Swiss-Prot record:
GO terms for cellular component: cytosol; nucleolus; nucleoplasm. It holds the Pfam family DUF4665. The modification Phosphoserine is found at residues 19, 69. Trans-acting factor in ribosome biogenesis required for efficient 40S and 60S subunit production. The lineage of its organism: Eukaryota, Metazoa, Chordata, Craniata, Vertebrata. This is Ribosomal biogenesis factor. Transmembrane segments: none annotated. It is found in: Nucleus, Nucleolus. The modification N6-acetyllysine is found at residue 21. Associates with the pre-60S ribosomal particles. One of its GO terms (biological process) is ribosome biogenesis. The keyword Transmembrane does not apply. It comes from Mus musculus (Mouse). It comes from the Eukaryota. Keywords: Acetylation, Nucleus, Phosphoprotein.
Length: 97
């Protein structure tokens, strides 16, 4: 009988609850942070991919505009080479300066 009495009357430490750590809360929070890290990594990769695509587009656009401007300048030069020099027009333009 004495054995049963001791089992029922265990004295609990008063500070047991305050010093007890909740492991379940940490376990629940841990997957969220790893998922956030994965999402951030995926977003970072997407942003880098889009930046590279825009840089390539800008380079292509610059090359395209250069080729267009060179073609137009060459056409103007060819057009002016075929015409005789207009001295009166040249003197009028110089007078405006």
């Amino acid at each position: 009988m004495a054995k049963n009495k001791l089992k029922g009357q265990k004295s609990r430490n008063v500070f047991h609850i305050a010093s007890h750590k909740t492991f379940k809360a940490k376990n629940k929070a841990k997957p969220v942070t790893t998922n956030l890290k994965k999402i951030n990594i995926m977003n970072h990769e997407k942003v880098n991919r889009m930046n590279r695509a825009f840089v390539n587009i800008q380079k292509e656009l610059a090359n395209f505009s250069k080729s267009l401007s060179l073609k137009s300048v060459q056409k103007e030069l060819k057009h002016h080479e075929n015409e005789p020099a207009n001295v009166d027009e040249a003197t009028r333009l110089m007078a405006q300066l």
